[in-house]
Amino acid sequence: MSVPRVGVLALQGDTREHLAALRECGAEPMTVRRRDELDAVDALVIPGGESTTMSHLLLDLDLLGPLRARLADGLPAYGSCAGMILLASEILDAGAAGRQALPLRAMNMTVRRNAFGSQVDSFEGDIEFAGLDDPVRAVFIRAPWVERVGDGVQVLARAAGHIVAVRQGAVLATAFHPEMTGDRRIHQLFVDIVTSAA
């Protein structure tokens, strides 16, 4: 694969920022809102947003089943914040009955929604990230954390003693928003994963 076509799930969140970051890292980015667009990509970014709303938009657009199937077939994916929540196999504090975040089950992990607190508890800080020489500036907004990782999941970063970045095969997830800082190393890591998986 010379230039990977990487979709950004364009339901909520920093779609434009992810598209720009992917372009800067040598990918061919495109938005994904429909089944034919999902079928056309080599990989997918699931941005932040509100995980319960995103789940139900996926249902309404008839994308939840097809996305689960593509992920089960090995589609490389990167989820930031709400994207991390959705990629999990289990979600704690998933939301009110009938309006819960629905796991895509792409990673063998349990994630707790809004674990770091509400909007007013949002913060940023420098964190060590496995494989990167210098710390990453991480922006946490109503962020989740990973409560448990299972077999095959590599922990890449922690903040305040909690797991905030993980990888399982060609699937990457962060509790923070690298698209907001101008530091492209996380997106470059994902593009490299996509290229290697081809």
Swiss-Prot record:
Pathway: Cofactor biosynthesis; pyridoxal 5'-phosphate biosynthesis. It catalyses: aldehydo-D-ribose 5-phosphate + D-glyceraldehyde 3-phosphate + L-glutamine = pyridoxal 5'-phosphate + L-glutamate + phosphate + 3 H2O + H(+); L-glutamine + H2O = L-glutamate + NH4(+). Keywords: Glutamine amidotransferase, Hydrolase, Lyase, Pyridoxal phosphate. PROSITE patterns: PDXT_SNO_1 (PS01236), PDXT_SNO_2 (PS51130). InterPro entries: Class_I_gatase-like, PdxT/SNO, PdxT/SNO_CS. GO terms for biological process: glutamine catabolic process; pyridoxal phosphate biosynthetic process; pyridoxine metabolic process. GO terms for cellular component: cytosol; glutaminase complex. Gene3D superfamilies: 3.40.50.880. Its EC number is 4.3.3.6, 3.5.1.2. L-glutamine binds at G49, E50, S51, R113, I141, R142. The active site is at C81 (nucleophile), H177 (charge relay system), E179 (charge relay system). GO terms for molecular function: amine-lyase activity; glutaminase activity; pyridoxal 5'-phosphate synthase (glutamine hydrolysing) activity. It holds the Pfam family SNO. Belongs to the glutaminase PdxT/SNO family. NCBIfam families: PLP_synth_Pdx2 (TIGR03800). In the presence of PdxS, forms a dodecamer of heterodimers. Only shows activity in the heterodimer. PANTHER family: PYRIDOXAL 5'-PHOSPHATE SYNTHASE SUBUNIT SNO (PTHR31559), PYRIDOXAL 5'-PHOSPHATE SYNTHASE SUBUNIT SNO1-RELATED (PTHR31559:SF0). Catalyzes the hydrolysis of glutamine to glutamate and ammonia as part of the biosynthesis of pyridoxal 5'-phosphate. The resulting ammonia molecule is channeled to the active site of PdxS. This is Pyridoxal 5'-phosphate synthase subunit PdxT. It comes from Mycobacterium tuberculosis (strain ATCC 25618 / H37Rv). The lineage of its organism: Bacteria, Bacillati, Actinomycetota, Actinomycetes, Mycobacteriales.
